[in-house]
């Protein structure tokens, strides 16, 4: 496997939404409707934890996680590449070093794109 630099691969399907739960939910609904239940569950858990701990850290983590997810999912070929790399690492049949490096690069590019 050759390490690849993450590239946009295609124009995004939708613009990058604001990093708010409402905007991220709308993006998840458009891009990956099957993930809406997980999004809602994560939001409920983050909100509950924020209230219980009187800390915004859980909500920040939620926005970061789903902001990166949306940034990647906006480009289906990039999302497919990430899934492939995760499968390579999960299979354990190859040295995962290059795949892990590319996964990190994809996530770093998505964080930058999302403004995180």
Residue ranges and their predicted role:
Residues 13, 62, 70-72, 76-87:
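Short interaction-prone segments
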Residues 79-116:
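Amphipathic alpha-helical binding modules
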Residues 22, 34-37, 57-60, 76, ...:
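Generic alpha-helical secondary structure signal
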Residues 27, 42, 46, 62, ...:
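Charge-rich, solvent-exposed alpha-helical interaction surfaces
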Residues 20-24, 75, 91, 111-112:
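Intrinsic-disorder/low-complexity, polar/charged segments
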């Amino acid at each position: 496997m050759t390490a690849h630099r993450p590239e946009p691969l295609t124009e995004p399907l939708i613009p990058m939404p604001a990093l708010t739960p409402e905007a991220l939910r709308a993006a998840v609904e458009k891009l990956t409707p099957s993930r809406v239940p997980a999004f809602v569950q994560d939001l409920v858990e983050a909100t509950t934890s924020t209230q219980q701990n009187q800390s915004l850290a859980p909500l920040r983590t939620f926005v970061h996680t789903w902001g990166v997810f949306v940034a990647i999912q906006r480009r289906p070929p990039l999302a497919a590449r990430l899934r492939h790399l995760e499968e390579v690492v999960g299979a354990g049949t190859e040295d995962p070093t290059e795949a892990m490096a590319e996964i990190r690069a994809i996530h770093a590019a998505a964080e930058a794109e999302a403004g995180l």
